[in-house]
Amino acid sequence: MKTKQISIALPVTGENEWQAVREPIMSGWLTQGPKVAEFEKQFAKRHKANHALAVTSCTTGLHLILEALELGPGDEVILPAFTWVATANVVLYCGAKPVFVDVCSKTFNIDPTKIAEKVSSKTKAIIPVHLFGLCADMNAIKAAIPDHVKVVEDAACAAGANYQGRWAGTLGDAASFSFHPRKSITTGEGGMITTNDRELAEHM
């Protein structure tokens, strides 16, 4: 029996994208050139963030954020049980422990009503995932955690997403976006960190 592979999503590209790629190639400036700085500036502006830092992937961005927040062995990080494995991997990269919380059956985002029971004296951060571009219930999430717990948005799928009049990427202490081909915008691979915390941005 023949089987047909069904893609999660296909990137939409055309003449505009070709010209955008062609310009830096023809200039000879393929990495860390003026186009990167321009992209960071425009991405920050679009999401109303004070700082945007281009990275190689959303995973790299999440890892950088956790390192900048100085997470390490003995620390715990709360995250949803339904997410891409990278969300948990970056916690392990830092030597910290991922603590999983079940998700809502309607949104597939982390269930705020189940967070408080997973908070301990070792909890240093929470990583809400804005799954499939739908922002997690950030108000309820923040109400469920102590004030000292850092909020790191896994906004891999959430470029341009909005939550109660605020943009994804500005709903916590920092966020990381993905530009993988199945995301709403793509650079082939790549990612972006956003934050309104100047000191944190400089540390990264």
Give the positions of each predicted feature.
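PLP-dependent aminotransferase-like
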Residues: 67-155, 162
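Conserved active-site segment immediately N-terminal to the catalytic lysine
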Residues: 150-186
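Phosphate-binding glycine-rich loop
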Residues: 29-76, 87-94, 100-102, 166
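N-terminal "arm"/small-domain region of PLP-dependent enzymes with the aminotransferase-like
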Residues: 1-30, 34
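Conserved core segment of the aminotransferase class I/II
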Residues: 181, 185-204
